[in-house]
Design a protein with these regions (language model features):
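Non-catalytic accessory regions flanking glycosidase/transglycosidase catalytic cores in CAZymes
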Residues: 1-185, 192-201, 226-400
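Active-site His/acidic residue clusters
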Residues: 205-221, 269
Length: 400
């Protein structure tokens, strides 16, 4: 059965949430994850809802009903006016599944999988251009995680084959899950040097929260860490290009960034492990459990704005960026079941930048006092960027 919220449309999607997504100014949404994708069968989310298989989701210890799949999400993207960045499973699957999904979503009618899409109600190709080849494959928490050399070989094979199918795709390799991974830097060098010819982007992921910093002042200066992350990965991308005497730059896709109180999740995981022990257990896993529903404050909004400014200041290298997540889970939008949807504090800086920051980005020269931080030394008290829209002859100063 479709959700019964008063604002639900004919596909079961809440229109109050759709309106907030439009207000937020999101232009591209990464789907279906995230850790979730590494054990996901894309076919499970196609066809009649009543015939879709129910699976266990290893990433979040929950039951996945597959009520929403790629066809449904494509329809939602049309309602919200967003582009889809599609991630493929490199944990339990790989080359064959990626090619079959590509044929299903983008193929012209006349082949088996494209015709299956047509039978499922999507007559036109979805024309999804940007594809993530796996998610956080360096992370030991990831289903099917790999060593740098293992992933480099795998992504090279998959990217090569996908570009044989569609040369115009934009392909994103997994970079480091954070700048604090033990393999940070060496992972990027291994992957990009091996697979340079067929890659267009490398991903970056970073989350921040006050309890994870040495002080409130250090937390407010989190963008310093993001800047170092960007410059390090950009240098690795340049090394790979030079090693190949290449003809294209590998851009950065900062496709997970934001504020996440990750210590709460780490505690939840530890409790699960303690409860399960070493015994076999047969209890059912919950459906759509309430996880990672962080409630944000004013300091979080300041950090969100500063991170957005940092991404804009480095838009020559960061060509795509996606804050994580969108609704309920570490999100700017909250939606209660059978209740209202509302905006969190972090909604506002993102929405303002998305609405007004267009055109060319400039780093302004602003004289401001310095503040002392334990992690980054002296940093400017003000963080800012200027954008200029030549078409409309309008400029914007973003500052926190």
């Amino acid at each position: 059965d479709l959700p019964s919220h008063p604002t639900a449309d004919e596909n079961g999607f809440r229109q109050d949430v759709i309106n907030l997504v439009k207000e937020l100014g999101v232009t591209c949404v990464r789907y279906p994850g995230g850790n979730f994708v590494s054990a996901y069968n894309w076919e499970d989310g196609t066809g009649p809802r009543g015939q879709r298989p129910i699976r266990r989701d290893l990433a979040w210890h929950s039951t996945e009903t597959n009520e929403v799949g790629i066809d449904d999400f494509y329809r939602w993207s049309k309602k919200t006016g967003t582009e889809i960045m599609l991630a493929v499973n490199m944990g339990t699957r790989g080359l064959k599944a990626a090619l079959e999904e590509l044929e299903y979503v983008n193929g012209a009618p006349g082949t088996e999988l494209a015709d299956r899409r047509v039978r499922n109600g999507i007559t036109e190709p979805m024309d999804i251009k940007m594809w993530c080849i796996g998610n956080e494959m360096d992370g030991p928490w990831q289903v099917g995680h790999m060593s740098p050399d293992e992933y480099a070989a795998a992504v090279d094979r998959v990217a090569h084959a996908m570009k044989l199918a569609e040369s115009g795709l934009e392909l994103v390799a997994c970079g480091s899950s954070s700048a604090h991974m033990s393999t940070f830097g060496s992972w990027e060098r291994s992957v990009l040097t091996k697979a340079y010819d067929n890659l267009d982007f490398v991903s970056c992921h970073a989350y921040y929260y006050e309890r994870g910093a040495k002080s409130l002042q250090d937390y407010l200066a989190s963008s310093q860490d993001m800047q170092t992350f960007i410059s390090t990965v950009a240098a690795c991308a340049d090394e790979a290009k030079n090693a190949h005497t290449g003809d294209h730059d590998i851009a950065l896709s900062f496709d997970e960034w934001g504020v996440w109180y990750s210590d709460v999740w780490n505690q939840q995981e530890a409790e699960w492990k303690a409860q399960s022990g070493k015994d076999l257990h047969h209890e059912s896993w919950p459906k759509a459990p309430r996880l990672l529903e962080d409630i944000y404050n004013a300091a979080d909004a300041v950090v969100e704005g500063s991170l957005m400014i940092t991404l804009l200041k480095h838009c020559d290298r960061v060509r795509s960026a996606s804050r994580a997540q969108l609704v309920n889970v570490i999100a700017p939008i909250m939606a209660e079941k059978n209740g209202p949807a509302w905006r969190q504090t972090v909604f506002y800086p993102f929405a303002e930048a998305a609405q007004h920051a267009h055109g060319i980005a400039y780093s302004p020269v602003i004289d401001s006092p310095n503040v002392e931080t334990e992690s980054f030394g002296l940093v400017n008290a003000l963080d800012s960027v200027i954008t200029w829209d030549e078409t409309n002859h309008s400029g914007l100063l973003l500052m926190v």
